[in-house]
Amino acid sequence: MSHYSMIDTYFSLDEDETETYLYLCRDLLKNKGEFQCTRDAFKFLSDYACLSAANQMELLFRVGRLDLIRRIFGQTWTPDSCPRYYMPICSPFRCLMALVNDFLSDKEVEEMYFLCAPRLESHLEPGSKKSFLRLASLLEDLELLGGDKLTFLRHLLTTIGRADLVKNLQV
């Protein structure tokens, strides 16, 4: 993975896409300490060659930036077009959380934060942006959410009236 492609990706993604990209990379960034900004996280991924070109194409595909795949790598990419020996970098759980994030409105995310307030009280930073992926990360840290722990999320989605998304969690 060249530094150029990481730099190009960093400058091309908007704030929400960057959050999704880094959430999908969370397993790679875990136990590496806290990054002061997203630029530091991208620098870490670039400096330590955590992502191959195929991995970065998968992440951009999951974020929905097919235009960047074509511009940076000069080709198209789909999960079916990768070789059989290629292991996906995004766990099914992280892909599912990114999918749920795409279908929630800001109002629904606010409702979820309100419902989780007693549990998150000491973990929330005042004035920080509230997003579903941030909430999912906090719930993972509190061990209330994980690949095998979706009950709490099902309850939250049912409470805010999003039974349609609960059906996606059955996978």
From Swiss-Prot:
Signal peptide: none
Source organism (scientific name): Equine herpesvirus 2 (strain 86/87) (EHV-2)
The UniProt record lists the keyword Repeat: yes
Top-level taxon: Viruses
Name assigned to this protein: Viral CASP8 and FADD-like apoptosis regulator
Segments forming domain DED: 1-74, 92-171
One Pfam family linked to the record: DED
Gene Ontology BP, a term: symbiont-mediated perturbation of host apoptosis
PROSITE patterns: DED
UniProt keyword list: Apoptosis, Host-virus interaction, Inhibition of host apoptosis by viral FLIP-like protein, Modulation of host cell apoptosis by virus, Repeat
Keyword Repeat set for record: yes
Subunit: Associates with the death-inducing signaling complex (DISC) formed by TNFRSF6, FADD and caspase-8. Interacts with FADD.
Function (record text): Inhibits TNFRSF1A, TNFRSF6, TNFRSF10 and TNFRSF12 induced apoptosis. May interfere with caspase-8 recruitment and activation at the death-inducing signaling complex (DISC). May lead to higher virus production and contribute to virus persistence and oncogenicity.
